[in-house]
């Protein structure tokens, strides 16, 4: 009488390992892209926080804090976990249409935040420039970040 065979053969185990390797080859880059996109989205959160400061500065006719700002001013920068957002540009009062750019811009530099060493290597050291519109929203104005990591809320329609 033959005894019952138990377990898997070596070939079956090798096939399973090969399948897992193929799946990992697709999953790891997709996961890295996901992490980079989520970290890049923090820049938009920082920029949204600067909208109020820009609005305050526009009352003085400037995008940025003036040199003689009061002691309560927070400055032209906001530092997050993965990036640094900074206000720049020259206010253009002649623009009145809500979709026009008002001259103010926010430059987000990834990798200069409080956890800069933990930023995805796909966006570390990259910049995203956001142009503020008259209606207060932002649109993409440049930078060297890969377009696939730019948050959808600010992507320019091509």
From Swiss-Prot:
The modification N-methylphenylalanine is found at residue 8. One of its GO terms (biological process) is cell adhesion. It comes from the Bacteria. Residues 1-7 form a propeptide. Keywords: Disulfide bond, Fimbrium, Membrane, Methylation, Transmembrane, Transmembrane helix. Gene3D superfamilies: Glycoprotein, Type 4 Pilin. NCBIfam families: IV_pilin_GFxxxE (TIGR02532). Belongs to the N-Me-Phe pilin family. This is Type IV major fimbrial protein FimA. It comes from Dichelobacter nodosus. The lineage of its organism: Bacteria, Pseudomonadati, Pseudomonadota, Gammaproteobacteria, Cardiobacteriales. The gene is fimA.
